């Protein structure tokens, strides 16, 4: 017999982050994403989506460091092909096989960065990773 959760379907699709929190030092990224007030109880959590959340996911030092580390992982695991790096990146982020059109769009994005913005291939891959970490499929659960 398989283990069955007693949680409702809405509760089963939640992601949680468990970290040690010092009440006076709340991580800025978590505060942007409705982190609970550490000075009072929180019986009900409200979900919000506001522009500052998206901006923090694009501009925060932490997320940019994660994108850089992700790009290095892709270069290590698929050193011979940018197409394979993109496919692996999308597969890891979305947890499904990427569609050919998604891979083409990502490659076009990276080529445009190199041609128009004079980004080197590593910078283009890092920016692709930043974009991938901001996909709705990664940030939100359906």
Question: What is each PLM-predicted segment?
Answer:
Residues 1-93, 97, 132-142:
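An acidic, gly/pro-interrupted, aromatic-rich
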Residues 128:
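Globin-like tetrapyrrole-binding proteins
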Residues 93, 106-115:
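Amphipathic alpha-helical segments that form the core helices of the histone-fold
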Residues 87, 99-107:
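Short, well-structured alpha-helical segments
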Residues 80-82, 115-122:
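Short, charged, surface-exposed loops that flank catalytic or proteolytic processing sites
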Residues 8-11, 119-124:
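Extracellular/periplasmic catalytic domains that process cell-envelope and extracellular macromolecules
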